[in-house]
């Protein structure tokens, strides 16, 4: 099986079109982690059921606003993903406190989805939500999340041009998403049923407060302050509308 990261965007091309400050934020973290790849690989292998060795695929990484992302490929060709929290962009975005809330929210959300639905989601293997001396990778390592990877196919891979459908109503515009091939209709129908089922299952996960999820060491999930700015939690939509948007 080919590495999952083979499908990620080209690193050099992506960096070239970025603002220099943003690109430097990524490149500097890649350089910071480079000497520590063996430690990261050993850490991941220690969680594998058979303790299989793995290698961090260093030349093809990706990123978002908050995390630098690498693939770890094991000797049996299975893959895990490790995400490292990047340094703040300024005094307000991606601060250590904000990053910690984001990580705890994501860990808790995945836990809830796995616990309460049949929706396939990655399994969190290990995480450390803030830089600290107790970080299992080392005291100077950034916050991280280690998780399994899920592979699959897009609807376009199946020959259905779903991008030609209205994202709000599902109404086909100018072209036939099936390309005139009626044998593909069951694929489209199953796709739409699965999307509807996912929305229905997620709608059943409800709490009586508004904020972001937090999870404790026993796996109990509660609602805490919002991940972005640490506001809340709020007891009502009215309170969220008034205070959550910074109004007095």
For each feature predicted by the language model, list its residue ranges:
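Juxta-kinase regulatory segment immediately upstream of eukaryotic protein kinase catalytic domains
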Residues: 2-59
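ATP-binding pocket architecture of kinase catalytic cores
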Residues: 57-248
